[in-house]
Amino acid sequence: MASNGHFSSVGDVDGGNYQHGVQVVDGDKEFNPNLSKYLAHENVTPAGFNYHLISVFGSQSTGKSTLLNTLFKTDFSVMSETERRQTTKGIWLSKNKRTASNEKEKMADNVLVMDVEGTDGRERGEDQDFERKSALFALATSEVLIVNIWEHQVGLYQGANMGLLKTVFEVNLQLFLKDTKSTPRSLLFFVIRDFVGTTPLENLRNTLMQDLQRIWMSLSKPEGTENSTIEDYFDFEFAGLPHKSFQPEKFASEVDKLSTRFRDGHRDPSSTSAKGTAVEGGVFLPEYHRRIPADGFAVYAEGIWDQIVNNKDLDLPTQQELLAQFRCDEIAREVLILFDETIGPFEVQQAEGVRSGIPLILGSLGVAMRAARGKTMTSFETEASRYHKRVFMTKKSELEEKIDTRLKALFSGQLSAAHKSGVTQFSEAVSAAVKAGQKKGASYDFAEIVTRERKLAIEKFENEASTTMVEGAPWSDYKQELSLFQKDLEKISSQLRKDEMRRLATRVERWVRSRLGDSIDLEFNALGSGRGGSRAPENGDKPSEKTIWDRIWSLFVNTVLDAERRFTERARSFDASLEEVDVGLWRLRRKSWGVLRSKIEEEMMEGNILHKLRENFEDKFRYDDVGVPRIWRPTDDIEGIYTTARESTLSLIPLLARFRLNETSAPPPLDKWVGHMPSSASAADEEDLAPIGGVDEDDGKSLEEEMTMLSEAKRQDLTVRFKKAADGVYVEAKRSAIGGITQVPLYFYGLLLALGWNEIIAVLRNPIYFIFLLLIGVGAYVTFRLNLWGPMINMAEAASRQAVEEGKRRLREFLESSDSGRQAMAMSGRNARGTEEYEMSSNLKSKGRRTDTSDDDNDDDL
């Protein structure tokens, strides 16, 4: 197989062929941008730190890819048995595919295997640049470096890849120069191929270790590491595999046994084993891991390769800068872990508060921010200041910027929460104080409440902001936020004042409605009292019907003037401006006219006004000038009295049809009384106001139309209906007068005496009849003298009515107990429903027209 054609190689547009792996770097040193897609495809990206990377080194055509395919069940390209030439070009990566039936044979999760181009190939010749760069890349990313050599190469320099290992050691000193406790270690795993067993594996190990020690001693070590040993940086493992072709079964068995070693391991801190020696269990020790999260590995690897490839002065970056970059980044990550432990919970709480929409002020945030920032920067400076000065300063600035970015976000969020919370609490506190003042029934100073609560809110905001500040941070200033907070408080104060003004206007309007309702009721109830009667006042002059509109207008104006005085006095305590008061008074006058208009329309409803006219007529027809009820006699001028009373009542209809003052015979000056809209009024101030004819030009109604209470059609209909009602009263009076003239003829008494003489003599001669007749006569005389005939007649009528009702009830119960009876009752009910509704409406006229005049007790305390 010539190349890894079934892998996703560098240059693939979609990079979708991920079944077997991906080419990380091609032969021309180009990095594959699809590496992250492959890791996502293999579900490695969400693994965090739960992954492991293995690289394999060795001479070209020594079976490296074959070893990986057999050991990890990968599908790297291998050399054809019929020809010997390069198969692996660049660096390839694949995920371990080996599975196991039990936990003892199972490998670690997410093992990534990197197949590196072989060394000492004829294709590159003496060009060792790629060899050195690939070694640097593998060492910077891998935990375990597998060195694939043949048994007969042990003891050789080039054949045993000692030149490559020297490069690895040099690169390691450049990358991982650290103190002992934090030095990342790597594992060099020597796999000796075609192991026959004649030479014990331990002897081969000793030979290789001696060669490695000599190479290490020959290196030019950085200051401070002159006396270091190779075991300070590397651990070593050795394994031998039989010949694949000559001993295939044993080869497969040893490979299976070898696969069980690639699992997570743990080094016992109390162990006395020498450094550099293998440990029992898995080969993946925590100190081998490069601590790069899986989701950032692709970016990390690309950045490492970019640094390696673009170094034009040396094959590898200079010691100091590369080491400084690595160490500073590592130290920054370490100190940020502690920083996250302190600040992270606050960030989570603040984010949760933002998502919930509830402003959350974090307690002790300022203390935690100051402590975390100071401790983080101090720890970084202590650990990283000994490295390259320029890199250190750059990394310090980056770390400080990163920390300050997060702290600034927390600081801004805290101020934002304090801002929102302060505004909400200010609004609630003012509203609560106002409600408390209303409940007590006493007057309260709204302006004083607002001033007091605003001062408390600003003090609380400044306290929260000052305790959250971080000294020395350029962003730790809250003057602008304080100014915005004060502006918002002013807006809220203005809005609360407007709301309170609206509530005041509503209370005043309700007060006006209550006062006008009672007064207008009295005026309309007094219709007809000019001639006395049931509606006449007990004392004082009787009002004239012609001046009813004058009295109503006077009552209306005086009531509204009193309401304006109350409104103005209360508005002063709100610290309202003159413009706001003018707008409020203008709205009050318009609203009050609407209340009066509505009340008059209620009184002028067809049922109500007809009832009033009938009462007026009956007062004039049934009562004399001094209010004494008339008892009709045949000699009375019933027609004349009826005509006079009817015409007098009919004259009220045109009077009530239009709102006109008797003094001027013209409508009241409503337009002048309401006045023009103040210049400070907004569209919102007039959107809930009903248009008024003669005042609002856009309404299209004149003042005359606004003052029309009854249309011509309603007047005519009302006249007709009233005349019918008056005719009924007249007929009733006429009938009662005619019924009183019936007399018994005189001859009837002579006839009665002649025909009843025998019965009279029989009664007079019989003592029992005579005594009974005498008792009846005495009883009748006494009843007459005591004026008891009326009560006795009433009692008799009541008893008869009760007897009739009882009979009806018994009859109804009887009918309801039979089907035919229920059907008859249903038909009778439908026929009588119209009559009953008319009677009910007639009986409830005066009650149905009443409006709810009950107001809050606070209305009188405006």
From Swiss-Prot:
Lumenal side: 765-767
PROSITE patterns found in the cross-reference section: G_GB1_RHD3 (PS51715)
Annotated keywords: Coiled coil, Endoplasmic reticulum, GTP-binding, Hydrolase, Membrane, Nucleotide-binding, Transmembrane, Transmembrane helix
Entry annotated with the keyword RNA-binding: no
Residues at which GTP binds: G58, S59, Q60, S61, T62, G63, K64, S65
Sections of the chain in a coiled coil: 476-500
EC number: 3.6.5.-
Protein name: Protein SEY1
Organism annotation: Arthroderma otae (strain ATCC MYA-4605 / CBS 113480)
Native organism taxonomy: Eukaryota, Fungi, Dikarya, Ascomycota, Pezizomycotina
